[in-house]
Regions:
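Non-Sec secretion/translocation targeting segments of pathogen effectors
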Residues: 94, 298, 332-342
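Extended, well-ordered protein cores
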Residues: 45, 63, 68-141, 150-153, ...
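Short N-terminal edge-element motif at the start of the domain
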Residues: 1, 124-184
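Repeat-associated, polar segments at repeat-unit boundaries in modular proteins
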Residues: 115-118, 122, 216, 221-225, ...
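Residues in well-ordered beta-strands of folded domains
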Residues: 117, 145-147, 158, 192, ...
C-alpha cells in the first residue's frame, strides 16, 4: 500500500480483501476525511485493522475545528462557536485557559494546524460491523478532484460538508482542499474529476469553464441534497422525476429544478391513488369537515382527474408535468425553442 496514510497501519495484520478495501478507501478520501482519520487514529489508538476499518466507517463520530492549532486558537474557536460568553465576561476569559479546559473535558488531538475531537464520550464504533463490501467513498452528494501547480496528484473535496461550525460559503471541505493544494483561491486550481450521487448528472467537468464556478455549484448542490426539501414527503423522488421529465443531465439545471419543484405537479410511482387523491383533495380545499361525505368521496377518480388535467408524463420515479407556474433560472440558461421566420 503506497498511500501516505498507510504508515498508520504499520504492524497490523490484514487479509487481501481488507488491504484492497483500505487502499481504495484511502485513494477516495477527501482532504477533510484524511485529517479526521488521522485525529481519530490518535484518539482511539487501534491495534487491529478491523478496528481501523470501524473508525473509517464511523468518521461521522468525529469533527474538525478548523484552524484551532493550539490552546489559544482552540479557546478562541470555542468561545466564538461553542460556548459563547457574554460581552462582559469576555475580558476575563483567557483563550489559552479556555482551550486547555475544553481539551481536558473531551477527547481530541491537534492535527496539522487543526483540532479533531470525538463528538461523544463513548463512541458507538463497536456497533459498526467492519465491512470490506462497504462503499469506498464517503457519504457525499458530489465530489470534485482538484489539482494545482503545487500539488499535481490532487485532492478530493466533497459536499455536503457536515461540519457544525463553519462558514457556509467557505466550508471546511473547500478550505482544507485549498490548504492541501497549497492554493489561495480556486483560480489557482483545476478540476480533473467529479462524481455525483445522481446518476442523471453526467460529464460534469465539461459543463464548466472554471473550477471556481463548479465548486460553488457543488457546494450549493450539497446543501440542497442535505436539506431534502426540509422533510417534504417524496421530495427526492419528485426532484429525480422532474429531472427525467426535463431531460436534465447538467448540474446547474438540476439546481434550478430543485428550487422550482413547486412549478410541477407530481405523483410518486407506486403510490396508493385513493390515499393520494384524499390528501390532494384536502390540500386543495375540495373536502370539507363532513365525515359522511368524506367517506363517500371517490378519491381515486379525483387523483385520476388530476393526472389527466395536467397531462402527467410517466418517468422511472413517478408522474410529473409542469403546472403553468414560471420556472426561475438562477444557475442555468434555459433553452429556447428556435423562432420561425417568414
Amino acid at each position: 500500500m503506497k498511500h501516505w496514510l498507510s504508515p498508520l497501519l504499520e504492524g497490523m495484520e490484514m487479509s487481501k480483501s481488507e488491504h484492497d478495501w483500505l487502499e481504495q478507501r484511502f485513494e477516495n478520501m477527501t482532504a477533510k476525511e484524511e485529517l479526521l482519520f488521522q485525529g481519530a487514529m490518535q484518539i482511539e489508538n487501534p491495534r487491529t485493522v478491523q478496528t481501523t476499518i470501524q473508525i473509517l466507517q464511523g468518521l461521522d463520530h468525529y469533527r474538525l475545528l478548523y484552524g484551532a492549532d493550539d490552546d489559544v486558537a482552540l479557546g478562541r474557536f470555542v468561545m466564538e462557536h461553542i460556548h459563547t460568553p457574554t460581552p462582559a465576561a469576555r475580558g476575563y476569559l483567557d483563550p489559552e485557559i479556555v482551550g486547555a479546559a475544553y481539551r481536558d473535558k473531551g477527547a481530541g488531538r491537534f492535527v496539522e494546524n487543526h483540532y479533531v475531537e470525538r463528538m461523544a464520550r463513548n463512541p458507538n464504533l463497536l456497533n459498526i460491523e467492519p465491512d470490506t463490501e462497504a462503499p469506498v467513498v464517503g457519504d457525499y452528494a458530489i465530489r470534485i478532484k482538484l489539482v494545482s501547480r503545487n500539488n499535481m496528484e490532487g485532492v478530493w473535496i466533497g459536499f455536503p460538508d457536515t461540519g457544525e461550525y463553519m462558514d457556509a460559503v467557505h466550508p471546511d471541505e473547500l478550505l482544507l482542499g485549498l490548504d492541501a493544494l497549497q492554493a489561495e483561491t480556486l483560480d489557482q486550481c483545476m478540476a480533473v474529476d467529479a462524481d455525483c450521487a445522481l446518476p442523471q448528472i453526467t460529464d460534469i467537468l465539461n459543463q464548466y469553464d472554471s473550477a471556481g464556478e463548479l465548486v460553488r455549484h457543488a457546494i450549493d448542490f450539497g446543501y440542497v441534497w442535505a436539506e431534502q426539501g426540509q422533510g417534504e414527503p417524496h421530495w427526492l423522488e419528485k426532484w429525480m422525476c422532474v429531472m427525467e421529465l426535463e431531460d436534465c443531465h447538467r448540474l446547474d439545471l438540476a439546481l434550478d429544478l430543485a428550487q422550482n419543484l413547486h412549478c410541477y405537479e407530481f405523483i410518486p410511482r407506486g403510490v396508493d391513488l385513493a390515499q393520494y387523491g384524499m390528501d390532494l383533495a384536502r390540500k386543495e380545499g375540495v373536502l370539507g369537515q363532513d365525515p359522511l361525505l368524506n367517506q363517500c368521496f371517490d378519491s381515486v377518480a379525483y387523483a385520476q382527474h388530476h393526472m389527466a388535467k395536467y397531462g402527467l408524463s410517466t418517468t422511472d420515479h413517478g408522474y410529473a408535468a409542469r403546472n403553468g407556474q414560471e420556472v426561475i433560472y438562477e444557475y442555468s440558461q434555459p433553452e429556447h425553442e428556435p423562432e420561425m421566420t417568414m
